[in-house]
């Protein structure tokens, strides 16, 4: 439960940080209310997605390594907890970040006296960025288990008493 709670808190923090640092998308709004994306719009989507995915990957590595340090809970149950919690935490962060990202919807500007440039809220463009965190968490935890070399994963409760 501690691991799940930590992953939820980290997901909320990830969403807050992402909403603050991810770049919004610039649009040109014409005086008659029509709008269009600027030529560099795809770059902004890529940067926003990369920031979210990389922050999730860092969280995934740190949480997997920290969970491995809990010797009494090593095993497939902790792997499922870390991966499932990472998926839930990343989803919470993604949804929260998308809601909190500041900006102006270009469709809401309407008719104005002159053309203008507005910045729409940041968006990752896809929900697939959520998968980076649990995927790397699973890879790191599995690597640590494979590298361990002990049949009992060095769990103190599984040592045989002779």
Where are the language model's segments positioned?
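Interfacial non-cytosolic loop connecting adjacent transmembrane helices
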Residues: 98-118
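Cytoplasmic membrane-interface segments at the C-terminal ends of transmembrane helices
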Residues: 1, 23, 61-82, 98-105, ...
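Hydrophobic alpha-helical membrane-insertion segments
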Residues: 3-19, 80-98
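N-terminal export and membrane-targeting signals
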Residues: 1-8, 50, 73-86, 125-132
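Hydrophobic alpha-helical transmembrane segments
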Residues: 44-58, 116-139
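Perimembrane loop-to-helix junctions flanking transmembrane segments
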Residues: 26-45, 111-114
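Membrane-helix exit/juxtamembrane interface segments
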Residues: 15-31, 99-103
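Alpha-helical transmembrane segments within multi-pass membrane transporters and channels
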Residues: 57-67, 85-88, 92
């Amino acid at each position: 439960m501690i691991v799940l709670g930590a992953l939820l808190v980290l997901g909320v923090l990830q969403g807050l940080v992402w909403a603050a640092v991810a770049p919004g998308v610039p649009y040109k709004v014409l005086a008659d209310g029509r709008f269009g994306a600027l030529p560099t719009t795809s770059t902004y989507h890529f940067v926003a997605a990369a920031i979210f995915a990389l922050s999730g990957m860092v969280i995934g590595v740190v949480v997997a390594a920290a969970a491995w340090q809990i010797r009494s809970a090593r095993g497939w149950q902790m792997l499922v907890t870390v991966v499932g919690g990472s998926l839930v935490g990343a989803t919470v962060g993604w949804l929260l970040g998308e809601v909190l990202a500041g900006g102006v919807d270009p469709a809401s500007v309407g008719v104005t006296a002159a053309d203008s440039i507005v910045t729409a809220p940041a968006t990752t463009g896809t929900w697939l960025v959520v998968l980076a965190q649990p995927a790397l968490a699973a890879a790191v935890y599995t690597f640590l288990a494979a590298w361990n070399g002990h049949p009992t994963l060095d769990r103190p409760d599984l040592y045989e008493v002779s």
